Amino acid sequence: MSQPPAAHVPVLYTQVLDGLQVTENGTYLDGTFGRGGHARGVLEHLGPGGRLLVMDKDPEAIAVAEQTFGGDARVSIHRGSFAGLGQVVAAATVDGILLDLGVSSPQLEVAGRGFSFGKDGPLDMRMDPDSGQSAAQWLAQATDREIADVLWTYGEERQSRRIARAIVARRAEQPLLRTAQLADLIASVMPRGDSKTHPATRSFQAIRIYINRELDDLETGLDAALAALKPGGRLAVISFHSLEDRIVKQFMARYAKAPPSNRRLPEAQPFVPTLQLVSGAIKADDAELNVNPRARSAVLRVAEKLELRIGDSLLERRSGRIPNPQSPIPASQGDAR
């Protein structure tokens, strides 16, 4: 299998393409284009009748997509979050969907985007700079309780209250407008330890996730992806921290495995799976880590959408409607699951 261009090294490149099982005339959707590393790999396997849809909420990523693939009739480009992919594709029409979650390498590397605590820049953190509040705007008006809740919920930061109090105290003296200001402030109030991780890592992650509604988008996007897939279509998701991976793992398990039985409740309708787990957590090997250290925290999960047998349910895959495995289907809609 060919390798991606050296200028951009997408994580788990070979594993993603193997997981998607790209076919020559298939339809695929990359919901997080970034700089197009995975998308290039998909295109290499598509023939003239294949189709690739790419999405990204970052206008800079969309500009790269248009410059790189704008002349390719097989590619259609859409600006927006993958949470809205149902507005881009019809139900049960896609053979494979990739979601590569979190912040992209270019976003981290450009100081002006305000994502990095290692490079001073405006305290922004928005993946779509034309939408919503910047991190600086939110920190300027949030209460210490709200800040602490965000740091704990999205960063699992144990010192969330201490950091929140410090932010509120500092902004009373001067506005927090730069990433270096915030990173230095957090470092100054954190207990000294032997950790090799920068003391602002969890806080920056938490604020970024909150500002961009990343976990909300993920939950909505997973539901939309399942509806969009054809029977036999595959969903591949790369996550970079435990909060994301937990949501992905639980989503796939919910539609692939029967819920635990409860002897105190009436016997439930037979469970009919909607997904089949193709693999457990896939991580980068040593060879990839030597080339791309960012892959160290990456976790890939792949699942395949199943076709319901005749009689299992009248909610057929081609309708795109997703049966809830926790709820029985009324008898009027067909055989109970």
From Swiss-Prot:
The keyword Cytoplasm applies. One of its GO terms (cellular component) is cytoplasm. One of its GO terms (biological process) is rRNA base methylation. SUPFAM superfamilies: Putative methyltransferase TM0872, insert domain, S-adenosyl-L-methionine-dependent methyltransferases. Residues 317-337 are annotated as: Disordered. One of its GO terms (molecular function) is rRNA (cytosine-N4-)-methyltransferase activity. Its EC number is 2.1.1.199. It is found in: Cytoplasm. Keywords: Cytoplasm, Methyltransferase, rRNA processing, S-adenosyl-L-methionine, Transferase. It comes from the Bacteria. S-adenosyl-L-methionine binds at G36, G37, H38, D56, F82, D100, Q107. Pfam families: Methyltransf_5. Signal peptide: none annotated. It catalyses: cytidine(1402) in 16S rRNA + S-adenosyl-L-methionine = N(4)-methylcytidine(1402) in 16S rRNA + S-adenosyl-L-homocysteine + H(+). Specifically methylates the N4 position of cytidine in position 1402 (C1402) of 16S rRNA. Belongs to the methyltransferase superfamily. RsmH family. This is Ribosomal RNA small subunit methyltransferase H. It comes from Xanthomonas oryzae pv. oryzae (strain KACC10331 / KXO85). The gene is rsmH.
